[in-house]
């Protein structure tokens, strides 16, 4: 695979593992660049950075999931507490009603 490109003041990143020829400022002369070794380094760095980024993303996702789970657990606990409180209030009410009924019955006797 041979590629031709004009060289400008900007950096050119070569992705292909191949011998590359550059055309210098419309000059008819060419020079060959063997870019296998530098490409491998670039690709390795790129892959390492991607792995790090993916690991960081995964770590963040895990943290977010844990936080969401904790929030859900807290919400469930709050709901349970509210339900318990409501049930206790109902029980208290029925107790007081029953006590009043008993008292009334006693008076009738």
UniProtKB/Swiss-Prot annotation:
Organism of origin: Dictyostelium discoideum (Social amoeba)
The protein's superkingdom reads Eukaryota
Q: Where is the composition biased (Low complexity)?
A: 39-88
UniProt region (Disordered), positions on chain: 36-109
Name it.
Answer: Putative uncharacterized protein DDB_G0284715
Q: Where is the composition biased (Basic residues)?
A: 99-109
């Amino acid at each position: 695979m041979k590629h031709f490109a004009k060289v400008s003041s900007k950096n050119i990143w070569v992705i292909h593992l191949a011998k590359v020829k550059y055309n210098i400022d419309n000059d008819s002369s060419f020079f060959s660049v063997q870019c296998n070794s530098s490409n491998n380094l670039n690709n390795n760095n790129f892959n390492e950075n991607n792995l790090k980024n993916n690991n960081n993303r995964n770590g963040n996702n895990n943290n977010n999931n844990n936080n969401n789970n904790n929030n859900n657990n807290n919400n469930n606990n709050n709901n349970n507490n509210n339900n318990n409180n409501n049930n206790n209030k109902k029980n208290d009410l029925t107790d007081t009603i029953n006590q009043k009924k008993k008292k009334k019955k006693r008076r009738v006797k």
